[in-house]
């Protein structure tokens, strides 16, 4: 009968291991916000559960330690029991097989599923005992975490290993596959992850497309420009575009124009403008968004590494990186980045990256090519600033510039017509047809 005590102990420990696995899954699933609601509703055990949630990593480490201890001890007891009935070698193999099956079914899959399905009831029932066990075993648990950190390359974890960004991305992908998260919701979540890796210059309005006004103009003129352009914030320049001295707000212009006797004709923009905010064009978008929220500022001027104005970015530009394009009643329909005209002909934005052109035509561009966009490639081949009607042949493609005048009357190219170069025109490296 002595040997059966080991078998009974092994069975009990396997059951305890399953219980700790269920607790692990439960406290990892519950939401702190929902726990606060349970506390307000005075649910039994909610107060203890809130204290567990306040230091959740430590309690997860403790549960993992208890589950592992139960499994290892159960294996040892099972080996002792089987040794009385089989040879030592076969006993080890049999014990290993039984524990693999038990660990997977009884400790792994089943209890974890139950823990996730009944997360709040299990967490409420076990929070107080778990806190008591934590108080008793705290020195051992912390010692093992410190030992694990010492053996882990890098900085380690203060509270033990937890989900990395890659693991969270995998969870989001799995949630979409199972229909829990919609495709657009998944895209927004992915955009949040990428926000910290995206510099502000990638979403800015380039300097060449900025709308600005001179500081010596009147408030009435600025009001007219704001109405015509549809912008509520306009940079104010001094001697040139690199000398931005402030930002004028439509709200201030309305107040100055309609509340004064002269309609703002005698008030200069310099008297109405507010200070401008300057940030490096390499600033990550997540940091820029936090800064804008903290300072209650909706526009920042971007400065490149040489100290020149690279462009501007608004809080709307940052939010569009998360939720997609935001268009209001003043926004005009923008030209699609790529328009398929048939017969391998495309109309593309002059700002389209040349890598996208390579994908359209299967063309390889050299890595040392000192341009990033189609417009830049056109200017490189021409050797000058391209005008509408300019045409060149590069990498077996014919590029034809299209455009017109901008809001200040300057001639700009906006789109480029792409088509395969004619075989008989392969020798013509440049053909310029002014439009």
Swiss-Prot record:
Keyword Cell membrane attributed: yes
Cellular localization per UniProt: Cell membrane
Entry keyword Protein transport: no
Topology versus the membrane: Multi-pass membrane protein
Residues in CBS domain copies: 204-267, 272-329
Keywords assigned by UniProt, alphabetized: CBS domain, Cell membrane, Membrane, Repeat, Transmembrane, Transmembrane helix
Entry's transmembrane regions: 7-27, 89-109
Superkingdom, taxonomy of origin: Bacteria
SUPFAM superfamilies: CBS-domain pair, FAD-binding/transporter-associated domain-like
GO molecular function, one term: flavin adenine dinucleotide binding
Domain CNNM transmembrane: 1-185
Gene Ontology CC annotation, any one: plasma membrane
Entry-linked InterPro entries: CBS_dom, CBS_dom_sf, CNNM, FAD-bd_PCMH-like_sf, FAD-bd_PCMH_sub2, Ion_transp-like_CBS, Transptr-assoc_dom
Database matches in PANTHER family: HEMOLYSIN-RELATED, UPF0053 INNER MEMBRANE PROTEIN YFJD
Family to which this protein belongs: Belongs to the UPF0053 family.
Protein's recorded name: UPF0053 protein Mb2387c
């Amino acid at each position: 009968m002595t040997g059966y005590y080991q078998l009974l102990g092994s069975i009990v420990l396997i059951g305890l291991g399953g219980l700790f696995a269920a607790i692990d899954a439960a406290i990892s699933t519950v939401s702190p916000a929902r726990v606060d609601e349970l506390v307000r509703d005075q649910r039994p055990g909610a107060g203890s559960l809130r204290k567990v949630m306040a230091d959740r990593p430590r309690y997860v480490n403790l549960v993992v330690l208890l589950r592992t201890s139960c499994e290892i001890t159960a294996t040892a007891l099972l080996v002792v029991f089987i040794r009385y009935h089989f040879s030592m070698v076969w006993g080890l193999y049999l014990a290993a097989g039984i524990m693999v099956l038990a660990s997977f079914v009884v400790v792994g899959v089943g209890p974890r599923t139950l823990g996730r399905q009944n997360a709040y009831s299990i967490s409420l029932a076990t929070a107080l005992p778990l806190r008591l066990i934590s108080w008793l075993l705290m020195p051992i648990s912390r010692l093992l975490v410190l030992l694990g950190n010492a053996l882990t390359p890098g900085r380690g974890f203060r509270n033990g290993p937890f989900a990395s960004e890659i693991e969270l991305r995998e969870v989001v992908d799995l949630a979409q596959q199972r229909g829990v998260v919609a495709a657009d919701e998944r895209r927004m979540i992915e955009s949040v992850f990428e926000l910290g890796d995206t510099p502000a210059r990638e979403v800015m309005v380039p300097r060449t497309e900025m709308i600005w006004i001179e500081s010596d103009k009147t408030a009435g003129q600025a009001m007219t420009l704001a109405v015509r352009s549809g912008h509520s914030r306009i940079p104010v320049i001094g001697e040139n575009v690199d000398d931005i001295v402030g930002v004028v707000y439509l709200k201030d212009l309305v107040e100055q124009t309609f509340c004064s006797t002269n309609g703002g004709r005698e008030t200069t923009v310099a008297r109405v403008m507010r200070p401008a905010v300057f940030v490096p064009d390499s600033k990550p978008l997540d940091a820029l968004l936090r800064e804008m929220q903290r300072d209650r500022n909706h526009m920042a001027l971007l400065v490149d590494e040489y100290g020149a104005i690279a462009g501007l970015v608004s809080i709307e530009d940052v939010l569009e990186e998360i939720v997609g394009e935001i268009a209001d009643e003043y926004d005009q329909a923008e030209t699609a980045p790529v328009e398929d005209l048939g017969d391998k002909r495309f109309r593309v934005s002059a700002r389209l990256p040349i890598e996208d052109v390579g994908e359209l035509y299967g063309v390889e561009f050299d890595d040392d090519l000192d341009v990033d966009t189609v417009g830049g490639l056109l200017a490189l081949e021409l050797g000058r600033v391209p005008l509408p009607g300019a045409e060149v042949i590069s990498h077996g493609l014919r590029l034809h510039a299209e455009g017109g005048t901008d809001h200040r009357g300057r001639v700009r190219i906006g789109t480029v017509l792409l088509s395969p170069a004619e075989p008989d025109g392969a020798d013509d490296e440049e053909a310029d047809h002014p439009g």
